[in-house]
Amino acid sequence: MAASKATFRYPVKKPVIPTRVQRWGNGKIPRLRLKKAQCGAVVFRPVAKALDDMFFDALDDGVVLKSLGGGYRDYARQEALWYDRMTLDKAEGKKPLVRRVWQGRTWYLKKMAPVAVPGTSNHGWGLSVDFDLSDPKTYAWLDRHAPSYGFFMEAKPTRPDGDKNPYFEPWHWTKVDA
């Protein structure tokens, strides 16, 4: 039987960006420093090792971890996602309002999931993976086991005041200690 929502821990931890990755810049990591992991995501090479270990252990438990194509994002991809999902028109913004400031202007989320300001995404450091959660067992497995491989979420489903957190992305997991 799948775990109920009440039993989830929603493990959250802020990542530390490795200095060896910072030298290239967000979204500018050389191709030779990236690797395609077993789940299908292209990530920073040290992240791929932990991701592959997690993949095979999940498989042993009957869970197949699959990426939704959400691994490394170069700067151009981050910018394209930004313009696709964000707008300067507050009236077009999705409720509750998700806003970000970029280039001195306030932008509002118009559709889909929140997106980081270009050049600040953990995908741009090759640290994050977006998993396919179409099988409910996948999230339950990640919630329970991913932290032991160094993978955490970046936001909980609710804010401290109990309101829904519009920044919650259950599919988005980041290696915090690459």
Regions picked out by a protein language model, each given a short descriptive name:
Residues 2-178:
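Cell-envelope/glycan interface and biosynthesis
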